[in-house]
Each structure stands twice: as structure tokens, then as C-alpha cells.
Amino acid sequence: MSSVVVVGTQWGDEGKGKITDYLSEKAEVVARYQGGNNAGHTIVFDGKKYKLHLIPSGIFYKDKICVIGNGMVIDPKALVEELAYLHDHGVDTSNLRISNRAHVILPYHIKLDIVEEDRKGANKIGTTRKGIGPAYMDKAARIGIRIADLLEKDTFAAKVAAVLEEKNRLFEKYYETDGFSAEEIVEEYFHYGEQIAKYVADTSVVLNDALDDGRRVLFEGAQGVMLDIDQGTYPFVTSSNPIAGGVTIGSGVGPSKIHHVVGVSKAYTTRVGDGPFPTELDDEIGDRIRKVGNEYGTTTGRPRRVGWFDSVVVRHARRVSGITDLSLNSIDVLTGLKTLKICTSYRYKGEVLDEFPASLNVLAECEPIYEELPGWEEDITGVKTLHELPENARTYVERVCQLTGIPLTVFSVGPDRSQTNMVRGVFA
């Protein structure tokens, strides 16, 4: 039995999809455990670039089971479209399994997300407007609709009708906009349910059977630790738990069966949407990193905010997620910068903070304390081992590991799979 969790250590977009795809070669089962189609990951397979939002990146390997776990919220329309996209590109999806306990995103969730963000104006959270938060709200309020319900038309119709009594009043009275027809939703979305029914299973059984049989299971996190609803920069967070602890809840696998947690990080920091960002760069260096690193959201297309590497953030991620291994990505993007900076701690009213504060008011007044390191000019995009890196690049990587307290397992020097390099194995 061997299991590995891949989590983002920052605010998402760290390159988890590529690392998951890379580690998928050794895995026999790949599972997602939280989030929905608000997550976007780009995978290069057989020379082709694919963008996925719901389906695990292991789908390209016919011999690997891919699981959408119970902790996810699924937009059936988006899922059917993503399946069609894969089929159009000749990808066999018969290895997909969808949890019958996962909750469903319906049109009223998406509309609620949009009108509420618009209502907040300047105080908006910066959601992807995909209905993720409202779906998780219904789940917590115990009025959510699950995949198992979607497949039973009478049950589905009764639940939608009951929920819309409240939702339509909310739309019409509070938001002063049109509500929805229960009949139209049921007809459209039951049809989507019919198209995905063959993939639906009790995925907790699938995953535990695989682990008990000694198979290698890879759990693929979405977003990042700093977007975790409990451990992130609340309220500028997602509505689920991307941390490794979310695996046990979102997949139905007990904590004793988790062995390695790979924390994925860029060699700098990015963030999409609103919220605090202590090391943000609003200058030419930030613009350069954004351009060279192609820092635009897979899901939203929005320019990502860019900043220096923040070891306070990644140490926080290590602690709350039990990270055992570091995957450091996009080192090549820093090539050509004369001086590099790493945030080692924060200064708050004369006090040095080594740990990430919970209060956003405190965080807003924190100034990053930087350590400066010399940059490098050499092209590193073809490097295969740490020893091949220029001395300054190697020193930078080593310092990141020292400041975060996480040993290096993987590093990448470019966007392609061939530019991802393993330092030590994670699967037994």
C-alpha cells in the first residue's frame, strides 16, 4: 500500500497538474478530493496541450483508474462538456469513476455566485463565478443534491422543487432578478446525469480496495493551502479544504492510509483574485515574471498577481498539511534577474513574525523581511539534475528548502513534462 497527496503550498496555480501528471506514471489510481471546475490545470501529453477543470490528470493513462471523490462539487454540464472535449481528442475515459456522494452544482448555484459577487462590489471575494461556494453552502445546510439523487428522476425533481422555493424567493425579492423553472432544470440536468451514470460508483470502496490491494494511489489537490477555508487567508479562500487533511473527508480514505504529502510551489509566488499578498510585486520585475511565466489563470484567463517567494507562507503550508516533500516549479522563470529575494519573515509594528498571522488586519500591516540572493544568466531549461544547475540557481533552491524546512523531491525548469526532474522517489 502506497499513497501520495499532491497539494499546492501557495494560492493555487503552482503547477500541481504537471506534477500530478508526472507522478501519475508510477500511480495506478489518481483521485481528486475537493473543489470543482473552479480549478484549472494544463497537461501536456504526447506533445499535445490539454486544459482540464474537473477530471483528474491521470485520465490520459488507460490503465489507471481516475476518481472524482465525494468531497468535490460537480457541475454535470461542465463535466459532460469536458468528457466530450476528451473524446474529441481521442482520449478514452472508461477509466473514470465518479462518487455517488459528490454534490451537484446547478444553475441557481452559478447565478447566486454571480449576483452575490456583483452585489459586494469592491468587497467581492474574487470567486471564479462557477457556483462552487453556493453548492458547498447547500451541502453544509443539508439541502444539497448529490450525484445519487441526480440519477433518480423523481427524487431529483422533488429536491429541486423544494430548494427552488427558497432560492427563487431569494432571487426575486432580494436580488431583484428572475428565478428558475424546476421543470427545465430537471429535464436538462437529468439528461446530463444519464450521460455520466456509467461512471458513477462508491469511490470510497474503489480507493480503499486499491490501497488494501497494495496499489499506488495519487491524490490530486486543487487550489492551494492558502485558499483552504480553514487554514487560508479567510474570507479570501475557496469553500473546501485543499490541505492534505481534506483527502480523508473528500475521498473516504482514512488518515492512516496517507504516506507522503508533496507540496508544490513555484520559485516565486502568484495569486488570482482578491485578498492579501505580502510579497506582491507591482513593478517591472513583477511584469517580467508574469510575462515570462505566462501567469494567466487557466480557468479565468485573468492576469495573476506576482510576488517574491514567501517562506512564511510555505512554512505555514508545511505545518497545516503535513508536507513531507517539496516540488519546486518554474525555476527557469527567474533566469536573467540580477537579484532575487526570498521573504524569511514579516515585520509587524517592530515585531518579527515567523508564522503566518490569522488576522487580515495584522497581515495588511506586515512588511516582508527579505533575504537577497544573486541571480543567474545561464539557460537552465535543459537541466536534468541539481548538479547541472548554475551555482547561484542551486544556492537559491537550497535556500528555499532550508527556509521552508521541506526536503526537495521534484524540481522543474520549464512547462513541459521533460523539464520535470525527480530528485527522490515518493512511491514505495
From Swiss-Prot:
Pathway: Purine metabolism; AMP biosynthesis via de novo pathway; AMP from IMP: step 1/2. Gene3D superfamilies: Adenylosuccinate Synthetase, subunit A, domain 1, Adenylosuccinate Synthetase, subunit A, domain 2, Adenylosuccinate Synthetase, subunit A, domain 3. Mg(2+) binds at D13, G40. It holds the Pfam family Adenylsucc_synt. IMP binds at D13, E14, G15, K16, N38, A39, G40, H41, T128, R142, Q223, T238, R302. GTP binds at residues 12-18, 40-42, 304, 330-332, 412-414. The keyword ATP-binding does not apply. PROSITE patterns: ADENYLOSUCCIN_SYN_1, ADENYLOSUCCIN_SYN_2. Substrate binds at T298, T299, T300, G301, R302, P303, R304. One of its GO terms (cellular component) is cytoplasm. Disulfide bonds: none annotated. Homodimer. Plays an important role in the de novo pathway of purine nucleotide biosynthesis. Catalyzes the first committed step in the biosynthesis of AMP from IMP. HAMAP family: Adenylosucc_synth (MF_00011). This is Adenylosuccinate synthetase. It comes from Shouchella clausii (strain KSM-K16). The lineage of its organism: Bacteria, Bacillati, Bacillota, Bacilli, Bacillales. The gene is purA.
